[in-house]
Amino acid sequence: MIETGKIINGDCIEVMKTLPDGSVDLIVTSPPYNVGINYDTHIDTLDMDVYWDWTKEWLTQAYQLLKDDGRVSINIPYETNVQNRGGRVFFVSEFYQVMKQVGFKFFGIVDLEEDSPHRSKTTAWGSWMSPSSPYIYNPKECVILAYKKHHIKKVKG
């Protein structure tokens, strides 16, 4: 049994392997987006195929941890730009395809919008004063809501 309210810090895949299957009601997470953020222990510039394999691995572990009426809430961007690793990615679509492969069932999506996007000063000019290659920054993110087998909770409260 997992201690209520306990925060566990560590590599998500390794930690999830130590927890009992079918013991979790809800997982809330915001995984790395693979856009080059300088994390202490995670490489955020993986080849996209490697990134999706890693995503499938941790989602599989999460799926096993959930109770049959368990749910998952995952904060991700709608799209990303991984310039030298394949260009623009419709991230939410790719991510959801992996979730379906693992077995998750879609419940909904929550649209998020940054009040003051940290990159809002990025222009869409591309080359100086030329529309040849505009840069588009989408400040919106979303939360994908999904469940394991049963949307309705067996135990209320």
Regions found by a protein language model. Name each.
Residues M1-G157:
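Core catalytic lobe of class I
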